A protein has these predicted regions:
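Secretory/export targeting leaders with adjacent low-complexity proregions
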Residues: 152-168, 172
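Long, charge-rich alpha-helical interaction segments
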Residues: 226-247
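Non-transmembrane alpha-helical segments in soluble domains
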Residues: 141-144, 154-157, 234
């Protein structure tokens, strides 16, 4: 944050120089898509479901982080954003994988706070209200490292000007052990891109703060698209109110998953993950292989 983050590549180069001095590694600014929701079972156990969708295939990197003075966390990064899908094939690839904590797309920390980033169709946010500046990747890192509740995450993010990376706009789905699920956004209709935190149960690639204006199965200009996937998730969750266990969460993820479409950046579900917010952990499957799930403890 102190180095300045308004220029994506300059920020990335600064991180590389600090983490991997002298190592010839190329890292590009990441891009993101997706669906996300909160589910609560009969015992009150809270889970976050999340599909990461992106048109180009990628390997998924499991990232465990133990920051000094911060909260431990687990999450996932897309290796194509680090310029290497097979990191074990070369020294440069192994070095690039060390950048994983700065390229995470989702995760959950030891307090049960989870976060997932989803892309939008609005112009990229680039606030300038004289506050410190944070970018998309650092927002994820900040929340996982420093927030013990959703409210703390909201308070942290609202203290910064947002710079959206990679020429796209984004919002964040944040949940905690109490099931306080909110979408954090920067209002596209406000000239100053006012900060918004909207309570929701599920969201995809449209503005939650204008959710009532968004129609399914179409583009809604700057307000986004993908409402039909949110409806599919809602149908599953509504059918199991009070009993949304892990099996129901997988059913909801499957209902919103997408096949490849080279013309749609938010197609092609790369991974589907369930984060346990009550007893922090992750269970993940890659590219819609629903019978092949790997589980990871914090």
């Amino acid at each position: 944050i102190a180095a300045g983050v308004r220029d994506d590549q300059a920020y990335i180069d600064a991180v590389v120089a600090q983490v991997l001095p002298g190592v010839p590694v190329h890292v590009q600014a990441p891009q993101f898509a997706c669906s996300a929701f909160v589910a609560v079972d009969a015992e009150g156990r809270v889970r976050t479901g999340r599909n990461y969708d992106f048109k180009d295939d990628t390997s998924a990197l499991l990232v465990r982080n133990h920051p000094r003075g911060g909260y431990a966390s687990i999450g996932f990064a897309a290796l194509n954003n680090l310029g290497v899908n097979t990191p074990l094939d070369s020294f440069a690839g192994r070095a690039a994988a060390l950048m994983g904590p700065f390229a995470q797309l989702d995760g959950v920390n030891e307090c049960g706070v989870s976060i997932a980033v989803l892309t939008l169709d609005s112009k990229p946010c680039d606030q300038d209200t004289q506050r410190p500046v944070i970018n998309t990747s650092l927002a994820i890192r900040l929340v996982l490292d420093r927030a013990a509740t959703t409210q703390e995450a909201v308070d942290l993010l609202s203290a910064y000007d947002m710079h959206a990376m990679a020429g796209r706009d984004y919002h964040f789905f944040i949940n905690d052990a109490a099931g306080d699920a909110r979408v954090v956004e920067w209002d596209p209709r406000d000239p100053d891109r006012a900060f918004k935190a909207t309570p929701v149960r599920q969201v995809t690639n449209f503005y939650a703060c204008y959710g009532d204006e968004v129609l399914p199965n179409q583009k809604n200009d700057e307000l986004g698209h993908g409402k039909e996937r949110a409806v599919a998730i809602a149908d599953v969750l509504d059918a199991h109110v009070g009993a949304q266990d892990e099996a129901v969460a997988w059913k909801a993820l499957r209902a919103a998953a997408q096949e490849p479409n080279p013309e749609d950046i938010t197609s092609n579900t790369q991974w589907s993950v369930i984060f346990d917010n009550t007893e922090p952990a992750a269970a993940i499957t890659l590219r819609r292989h629903w019978g092949d799930v790997d589980a990871f403890a914090l």
